[in-house]
Every structure is written in structure tokens, then in C-alpha cells.
Amino acid sequence: MIQSKKLTLGICLVLLIILIVGYVIMTKTNGRNAQIKDTFNQTLKLYPTKNLDGFYDKEGFRDQEFKKGDKGTWIVNSEMVIEPKGKDMETRGMVLYINRNTRTTKGYYFISEMTDDSNGRPKDDEKRYPVKMEHNKIIPTKPLPNDKLKKEIENLKFFVQYGNFKDINDYKDGDISYNPNVPSYSAKYQLNNDDYNVQQLRKRYDIPTKQAPKLLLKGDGDLKGSSVGSKNIEFTFVENKEENIYFTDSVQYTPSEDTRYESN
């Protein structure tokens, strides 16, 4: 009888320990997930910034990487990647470096085509066209091969100018992950074609699929904030070995000396 009571007590004690450990792990995970969401929300608050000139007066997260007196540089990037079945992958996009010290903006529009060389190895053929921004208008700084490309560059709008995530907290069934070794973190949501941001992308790009995309928010670096980390937004419409269609966007605040770039 006594042994039976001891056995029962032992089992209860083990179950109690399991419940406590499980609760601690769940609480820690929920807390980290909330921190990841909050980290992304800090970036998503920038959407929309309709006039890119507004970044001259915006300050992002600063740490010891910034030198005294450096107001920092914003890097904005939007690109559309389309690889239909049986065809080469083509990427079109633009990168701007918005320098808050000089209140000047330079960058480039690029067209990249992924092909195979004579040995069947992947080869990335990229062309860059330098641009500058004045009074919120994109201006090519070198002659362009045709008027169509000129119009395409001048009319481009970055996703940060029209994207809107005011309903991000209403997105359901998000898959949140964290890798402490990098560290890196992400949040993934399945969207539908009625989503505002999806409609805006379809309005501006010829997206050759009716499939609704997944929204993937990706980040790396310290969750508390870091100028050496990055955060990216990706709308993945199709992703497989034969076909890839996705849109990526990023807005990053960095020390000005780290923003050298090349254009050709």
C-alpha cells in the first residue's frame, strides 16, 4: 500500500515537472514570437511613405556602428522576379541610397537575367542603369537604349510608397520561426488575392499566375535591433524547380560609410 502511494506520488511529481517545463517553454516561445512580431512591426510602420524625400527626415535604429555626426543612409530596394516554365529567370528592380547627411539620393535600376553558359552552369547577366532622385522623381543619369526603358524607370514606385500593413495583426495562422545560431527569424502568412498589397502588386506588375501568394517576413541580427542586420518582405506567388514568381522589398537604415555601390 505504501509502495503504491509512493509510486502514485512519483508519477504525479514527474507529471508536474513535465507540465511546469512545458509551461515555461510555451511562455518563452510565446514571448519570443511576440518580440519577433514587434520587431517586424517597427519596420512595417514605414509603409507607406509615399514621398521618398520623407526619408531625409526619418531616423532609424542607431547603435555603436554609427559614427558621431552621421545621420545615416536609408537603402530602399524593390524587385520583381519572374521565371515562367521553360524560360529564363528575369529580375527587374531598383535600389536607392538616400543619404541623410547630404540630402541626396543615388542608385540604379537593374535588369538581371539568369541563363546557362556553354557548360550548362547558371550565369547571371545583370545590367545596371544609374539614377538619381530629385523632388521625389527618379531621373536616369546616363543615356538609355530606348524610351520604353526610360519610362519604366521614371514610373517605378517602390513598394514602401504604396504598401500598407495596418492590418498585419489581423493575419491568421502565421508560421513564426527563430534560429538563435545566426540569429535569424521569420513570419509566414498565406494571403488571398483580395489582400490590399496583393492587389497593388498585380496592378503594377504583369504577374503571370492567379495563385495567391504567401507573405514572408525575414530578418537577421539582434531582435532588439542592429544596424548590421536586415529585414526583407517577400510575396511568393509560385516557387518550385520549374517556375518561380516572387516580389521582394526591403528598407534598411545603415551607417553612411557602408553604402558604397557600383553601377554600370
Swiss-Prot record:
The chain crosses the membrane at residues 7-27. It comes from Staphylococcus aureus (strain MRSA252). Keywords: Cell membrane, Membrane, Transmembrane, Transmembrane helix. GO terms for cellular component: plasma membrane. This is Uncharacterized protein SAR2570. Belongs to the staphylococcal tandem lipoprotein family. NCBIfam families: SA_tandem_lipo. It is found in: Cell membrane.
